[in-house]
């Protein structure tokens, strides 16, 4: 029972209690760049979840055989291999989205969330809990991406997943798209508002005054 509770906590805790973007402020670069559309935010979420979960699993699997002096290099090699797989799959089956995501798929290699979980958790834990931890942190990352992407696409273009939701003036409706929401600064402010909202709801996440 306790094991099941721990696995459940590993999946759910990174969403609000220990969100990698909102609390740890990691992975912000891609969060600013790929959230103009829900479609790209969703695909990026799946990509990061895939890489984080499997890199955690493989690092944990061989953790006792990795010399301490080269552990970061080994982790990077595993992560890079998985990112190449993701990149090739996207180019083969989702080429348009792959072009929109551009270099940010490759930059998953240097994503602090992926590297951080491999070093802090997978190197000290069994493979299955490490895999679940990767899924959880991918969900936490995706929660922020999808929330930001929802508001940016809805207010920036009046659409969700490319489908018109708010009747646009150009089509005889009433909504004038807000172009500012499609620029990177809007994502920065939205993430800031999310951090404020989460820390208002969970005051224990506020840093203690020095």
UniProtKB/Swiss-Prot annotation:
- Which UniProt key words apply to this protein? Cell inner membrane, Cell membrane, Ion transport, Membrane, NAD, Sodium, Sodium transport, Translocase, Transmembrane, Transmembrane helix, Transport, Ubiquinone
List the catalysed reactions.
a ubiquinone + n Na(+)(in) + NADH + H(+) = a ubiquinol + n Na(+)(out) + NAD(+)
The entry's localization annotation reads:
Cell inner membrane
What Pfam families does UniProt report for this protein, alphabetically?
A: Rnf-Nqr (PF02508)
Can you name the source organism?
Answer: Vibrio cholerae serotype O1 (strain ATCC 39541 / Classical Ogawa 395 / O395)
What family is this protein classified in? Belongs to the NqrDE/RnfAE family.
Tree of life domain: Bacteria
Membrane-spanning ranges: 42-62, 72-92, 103-123, 131-151, 178-198
Give me the gene this protein comes from.
Answer: nqrD
- What is annotated about its quaternary structure and interactions? Composed of six subunits; NqrA, NqrB, NqrC, NqrD, NqrE and NqrF.
Q: What does this protein do?
A: NQR complex catalyzes the reduction of ubiquinone-1 to ubiquinol by two successive reactions, coupled with the transport of Na(+) ions from the cytoplasm to the periplasm. NqrA to NqrE are probably involved in the second step, the conversion of ubisemiquinone to ubiquinol.
Q: What is this protein called?
A: Na(+)-translocating NADH-quinone reductase subunit D
Any Gene Ontology biological process? sodium ion transport
**PANTHER family cross-referenced by the UniProt entry:** ELECTRON TRANSPORT COMPLEX PROTEIN RNFE, NA(+)-TRANSLOCATING NADH-QUINONE REDUCTASE SUBUNIT D
Enzyme Commission number(s) from the entry: 7.2.1.1
Is NAD there in the keyword field? yes
Q: Name one GO molecular function term.
A: oxidoreductase activity, acting on NAD(P)H, quinone or similar compound as acceptor
**Which HAMAP family does UniProt cross-reference here?**
NqrD
Q: How does it sit in the membrane?
A: Multi-pass membrane protein
